[in-house]
UniProtKB/Swiss-Prot annotation:
Disulfide bonds: none annotated. Belongs to the class I-like SAM-binding methyltransferase superfamily. rRNA adenine N(6)-methyltransferase family. It catalyses: adenosine(1779)/adenosine(1780) in 18S rRNA + 4 S-adenosyl-L-methionine = N(6)-dimethyladenosine(1779)/N(6)-dimethyladenosine(1780) in 18S rRNA + 4 S-adenosyl-L-homocysteine + 4 H(+). S-adenosyl-L-methionine binds at H37, L39, G64, E85, D113, N128. Specifically dimethylates two adjacent adenosines in the loop of a conserved hairpin near the 3'-end of 18S rRNA in the 40S particle. Involved in the pre-rRNA processing steps leading to small-subunit rRNA production independently of its RNA-modifying catalytic activity. Part of the small subunit (SSU) processome, first precursor of the small eukaryotic ribosomal subunit. This is Dimethyladenosine transferase. Its main location: nucleus. It is found in: Nucleus, Nucleoplasm; Nucleus, Nucleolus. The keyword rRNA processing applies. Gene3D superfamilies: 1.10.8.480, Vaccinia Virus protein VP39. GO terms for biological process: positive regulation of rRNA processing; ribosomal small subunit biogenesis; rRNA methylation. It is an enzyme of class 2 (transferase).
Length: 313
């Protein structure tokens, strides 16, 4: 019993020490569970803002402003900063930081979950993102209208490398091709974990995203439906990927709806498996693998399916 008590006491002390390490200079506790890792290196803050090439007339969206290290610098460069913050304690810190200064009138704070909010108009987005919202936030940004000029965002290193991966790269995936369909993506710099307070467990990178304007003339839901199927097993041939019974059931359902709408008679001996294989063969993609296919390849494949009445959404 005494040993158990001693071990429990040790764990309590360890937790107390960990909590102590999360305190800011003002005694504020950071919640790493929701991605509160404050970027503390002013050189990196300035470099990120420089990469955004802000104009004095810009409205800037910042997500996860924390204690305002980057916010204050953005306010000095832009016409207005709209900061989205989930934690009311950090909202109070933000207001306190600019209170009584000329910058206060240029700051607007949106309190709540940015993924659930309607994004306002903005020219540029600059953010040290909570890493757990990286993927949904990127696509919320890229599907946002009206178009913004650019986004300069901090991500977990591996996520950033997936964003910029090319066909044939080990990290090339659905995220890579979907992002690159809608935007130009560039890896700007690596950021070590010790530049944050408290330091995260992973290394980070900064990425610049510029949406393609006008966007490609493609139904994104259709596109993503096709890409989702092919990247489930990206090392498989497309012929093998489309042999999944769940995939064939979905495509047959969509095909029958298409035929019904367009008054097309379906033969009694119709086989969706044969139809799919015929399309893959005629387009030359039967033995191709998603890992090595680029955007143009997927556009040709999607058009090949659509021309035969097969849709993915």
């Amino acid at each position: 019993m005494p040993k158990i008590k001693s071990a429990a006491s040790g764990r309590r002390r360890e937790r107390q020490q960990q909590r102590g390490q999360l305190k800011s200079a003002g005694g504020l506790m950071f919640n790493t569970g929701i991605g509160q890792h404050i970027l503390k290196n002013p050189l990196i803050v300035n470099s990120i803002i420089d990469k955004a090439a802000l104009r004095p007339t810009d409205v800037v969206l910042e997500v996860g402003p924390g204690t305002g290290n980057m916010t204050v610098k953005l306010l000095e460069k832009a016409k207005k900063v709209i900061a989205c913050e989930l934690d009311p304690r950090l909202v109070a810190e933000l207001h306190k930081r600019v209170q009584g200064t000329p910058l206060a009138s240029k700051l607007q704070v949106m309190v709540g979950d940015v993924l659930k909010a309607d994004l306002p108009f903005f020219d540029a987005c600059v953010a040290n993102l909570p890493y757990q919202i990286s993927s949904p936030f990127v696509f919320k940004l890229l599907l946002h209208r009206p178009f913004f000029r650019c986004a300069v965002l901090m991500f977990q290193r591996e996520f950033a490398l997936r964003l910029v991966a090319k066909p044939g790269d080990k990290l090339y995936c659905r995220l890579s091709i979907n992002t690159q369909l809608l935007a130009r993506v560039d890896h700007l710099m690596k950021v070590g974990k010790n530049n944050f307070r408290p330091p995260p467990k992973v290394e980070s990178s900064v990425v610049r995203i510029e949406p393609k304007n006008p966007p490609p003339p493609i139904n994104f839901q259709e596109w993503d439906g096709l890409v989702r199927i092919t990247f489930v097993r990206k090392n498989k041939t497309l012929s093998a990927a489309f042999k999944s019974s769940a995939v064939q059931q979905l495509l047959e359902k969509n095909y029958r709806i298409h035929c019904s709408v367009h008054n097309i008679i379906i033969p009694e001996d119709f086989s969706i498996a044969d139809k799919i294989q015929q399309i893959l063969t005629s387009t030359g993609f039967s033995d191709k693998r998603a890992r090595s296919m680029d955007i143009d390849d997927f556009i040709r494949l999607l058009h090949g399916f659509n021309a035969e009445g097969i849709h993915f959404s």
